[in-house]
Amino acid sequence: MAIDPHPPEGRLAEDRRLGAGRSDWSSWPTYEAAALGLPGSWWYPVMWSSQLGRKPVAEQLLGEQVVFVREAGRVFALNDRCPHRGVPLSLGTKEFPGTITCPYHGWTYDLDNGVLRAVITDGPDSPICGKVAVRTYPVAERLGLIWVFMGDGDGDPPPVDDAIPRELLEHDFAMGGNIETRHGGWRFGAENGYDEGHAKYLHRNSLWRLFRLMPTWTRTRVVPTDDGWITRVQTEVHWEADFPGLGTWSGRRWWKRGATSKMLGASPSKAAKADPAIASLDVPGNQSIRLPGLLRIVHSRFIHYEWYVPVDEDRYKYVQIMVEFKAGLAAQMFKLRYLLLFRWLFHGQFSAQDEWMVNVMDAPPERLYRPDVSITAWRRLCEQAPRNGQAVRKG
């Protein structure tokens, strides 16, 4: 079908009204190029510590194949490819202490430094030993998770504690969580998590919010806070809206708990019944995000965190944890509530609504609107990644 090179003015006006959207993310070049993760060096949570036993575990992270091995209680991570013929080392075995052996020809690598120590099929005097090595990655165990340091540069990485929210280092807490691989790419996952607009509509009928009223629309600003976070602060909260020529829309239902003036943009850390650990955060709003992709949602009694760890250009590891700052019997009661309730309602059905949208999202092109101030603030933060990465410390 031929295309009219001179469309009528009416059609041009219609095209301008609808908008063609952005052709790319060229306003955020670092972000646009970050399909496999932001530049710089970062600690990422990968799996539960309990998932790594005697057998090697293969993972793909930031487009790289990595094998995790536990030896004498310590975790190691190596590039999951034997340099000989490209066979995954994760298919191999531990024939000698402190090593992993390729299943094909018996090439055996040191877990600590990746150096080829022996070639079983070439005898003890194999001349290639010591001349070949696979890449190794720093690893650590914290919060019941295995963390890996993915980045470039020589020298020792910064402490893994630098990547963990300080409140989790300063207080006792009970925790529940979920890790799964999702489609859509880590950037869409992070944008969905920090997006101001979607929760009020997409999640209005979720079981997690079944008895709690959601606003219809809000006004929001984004402010930088401590430790590299940017925080959403609601300046206006509206529970219904009258749309001219259409009618009134409201999420009010007889069974939903009504809103009060104290709920209008209030900081959960300043709530009268806020947990002391949460009150000490003194955050201006309940939702924050920081590099390289860690979301924190603060409630008055608990905090939810989620990491978006790139797997490849289309997939990411979605790591969710929920914590209450409790000890003893109260901690055990939280764990029970998590297993019986929160795991299914929040980390399950509620989160599955987000997965649905992220999986079908197709942008750019895109046309942003006022609530997307949260998304553009996040993209601007990502542009600082080359300067703000968890840089390798020399010496």
Give names to the regions the model predicted:
Residues A2-A20, W25-Y31, M47-A174:
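Rieske [2Fe-2S] iron-sulfur-binding domain
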Residues I3-P7, R74, D80, D154-G395:
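C-terminal catalytic domain of Rieske-type non-heme iron oxygenases
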Residues A20-S23, L38, C102, P224, ...:
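Alpha-helical structural elements
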Residues E32-G40:
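Non-catalytic accessory segments flanking enzyme active sites
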Residues G40, A133, A140-R142, F302, ...:
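A short, structural micro-pattern
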